Amino acid sequence: MLLSVFLLNGCASNIADKASSVTKEKLQISNSTEKVMNSDENTKVAEENTKTTQDEGEKTNSALNGNLKVHFINVGQADSILIQQGSKFMLIDAGNNGDGKLVVNYLLEQGVKNLDYVIGTHPHEDHIGGLDYIINDFRIGKIYLPKVTSTTKSFGDVVAAIKNKGMKATVPIPGETFNLGSAKCTILAPNSSKYKDLNNYSVVVKLEFGSNSFLFTGDAEDISESEILAKGFDVKADLLKIGHHGSRSSTSDEFLAKVNPKYAVISTEIGNDYGHPHKETMDKLKNKNIPVYRTDELGTIIVTSNGKTISFNTKPGSYTAGRP
């Protein structure tokens, strides 16, 4: 299996954002990358976790077991989301390289010993930088990574950690479903095999718990959003994790209208170099009267669902755009 090699350029969009001011060390990934990026083989525990069908997921979702908690961990200009349903846990991204220990400690504080699912949305450092710490420190059922590689040290560290764990990464397939306790997860993207921008390789996941739903978008931009809509996926969700830290390159008018969220969450850092969240995005949310919860103003955001209603550990933030 040949994987296209891309160069990591931070989290910035090719057309909208500044290049990162931090020069990242490069590492040539050996052929062992292909061995861990395998969509057909998984560890025994992963196979046990994924033996449920869509019908079984719907049946389970009708008899909820406890609450659902979503932790948008404050990792600055980066993403890391811990999702808990009953005794089951999933982690989406793990922040920058310097956030690894922070995320590990946060998970331990929440009583996490095993992670049923880990998703590295795409190879940018601000999403997978701390992922090697997670892989090294926790027992993991299944790891999802998109079918793309990078020459960066951050990506190389993740590949090495997976290999050293004796695991293989699974390539996500749009339309695939799996259960996290009583919650049902559906993969919506990526829908193409080749993009100019690494952001559009982002794994997009919709989670349903009772009558509540959540959409996690990574750094997916308008190209990926339009592909998701063209595929006819149901993107309606109560809560939307705004793509790409609130960049103008994500959250198109059409996509936002289809999702029609009651709440929005943005993971970003005050005074970041990119001016996130951009004014265009904040104006869209303000015009639709969608409350915005943002880590740069509120710190870690914890969302709780009982399957019928959603509550937050804090009040909403402002619609103020970032300053470049």
Q: Can you say where each PLM-predicted feature lies in the sequence?
A:
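Non-globular, low-confidence helical/coil segments that flank catalytic cores
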Residues: 4-324
